Amino acid sequence: ITGKEGKVKYTNNSNFFVLGPSGSGKSFFMNSVMRQYYEQDTDVVIVDTGDSYEGICNYFEGTYISYSKEKPISMNPFKITELEYEENFGEKKNFLKSLVFQLFKGTDYPTKIEDTIINQTITEYYEAYFHPFEKFSTKERSQLKEMLLLEDKKNGKYDQYEQEMEERYDRIMEEKETSSRNARLIDKLQAVLDDTAATEGEKKAALHQLQRLTPELIEKNYLLRIERKIDKMERQRKNLRVQELSFNSYYEFALERIPQLIVQQNIEFAIHDFAAILKPFYRGGEQEHILNNDLDASLFDEKFIVFEIDKVKDDPILFPLIVLIIMDVFTQKMRIKKGRKCLVIEEAWKAIATPVMANYIKYLYKTARKHWAMVGVVTQEIQDITSSPIVKEAIVNNSDVFMLLDQSKFKDKFSEIKATLALTENDCQKIFTINGLDNKEGRSPFKEVFIKRGLVGDVFGVEEPPECYMAYTTEKQEKEALKFYKRRLGSDYRTAIETFVSDWHLSGIQKSLEFSQKVLKERKVFNYKQSS
């Protein structure tokens, strides 16, 4: 499944894409894949929206985190160490930009100005924390001076100042002719013009020199203005302090810094909209806990983690946000842990399949390979892969392993899937044999799956013992019956499964669902004994 078989390497990466319509056995198959990965010493992180992995997570004594209003999933994606800042800040910054724009813009793409400003605030925010600003260097002041002068020449402020100075000079000259009281306002060069002892040639030369020096004097005076402006910018930067890293402190920093940038760069940015939209996640807001609480550090040591976020899947703001910060947790885990890592995103991936997220998804997929990690996306709707360019460009194109379950429901529309996944005619022929061959005799119940690794694709049967079936099941009554056994036995999940399966077989009941219904009806653990 990972693209390798012994020493044979079929793929360039282990990222995978799974397509299986409802009823095709997708959940059972994915549980089987996760079991195999875990038993091969892989750290597993799953984002789910339907309790499909609750049983196997309990079996492996993993961590099952289910979102609720009483116990929401909360993290602090803004918190990083100095080492992370020095070594991986570029990647972290891109993630935080995606996060901020997910909050601010939703599915809308940010403008160039918005991207530039948010990028600058994030950069300066971390500089203020790790390397607090004191003053501009001589080189920085010189560059700022040139930039600000050029900016004012571009926007007409310099021309306006120059015109005002020239008008002021002309006004003084006119007043000189009509009133001797203004003679004191004229500079040394103008005094030459007033000197009755001066010859006409000297007066003419003085007037010519005055006219020649005026632009230089104007620019020199204007540069003094710019120096004062830089002094103010320096004071503003120095006053921007960050004491701790969190969304709260970033929000405060951004709301102080962005208005300064708007004035300095003469740009437009919807600062009031920005402040209002992000405010619910700030201190005292309805969602203040989401981005300001430190993540339980023990999660980085857990080998099997399931985030169950079904309760928030209909929230257009929280759903993509939570998926995004879980992906960031995996990214951190990916760097910290040395062994193989796997992130599986079930239907929740649709929350982030937006233009704003496209670059981050591509980055995650490409980075996974460098850190012995893989990302898998699981879906059941054909439209999910045929109607979204984000899926094709960011997910499919960066996945070398495709897994398709029974596609008979999609037979009339399969040409679109074939084109999107670049399947061959031979692949398609194999796919439409899934669960259709006469190969069931002498085997326990199973379903089939087509797995393509690189250019090589084949159909495989998914056969598991009844103990695994009970760990994987998503049938509500079977899950409830198993939980009942666990409570009554006071045992761990494995013992409960072993006892349940033993009783099921010894009961003579063929189907696990029928036995589960019997357990729930009679409310007891049967403890059947094997007859000698």
Task: Give residue spans per PLM region.
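P-loop NTPase motor domains
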Residues: 1, 7, 54-63, 69-71, ...
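Conserved P-loop NTPase motor cores
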Residues: 3-36, 41-53, 61-72, 310-430, ...
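P-loop NTPase motor core of the ASCE superfamily
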Residues: 86-139, 389-532
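Sequence-level motif detector for i,i+2 pairs with an aromatic at +2
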Residues: 13, 301-304, 446, 457
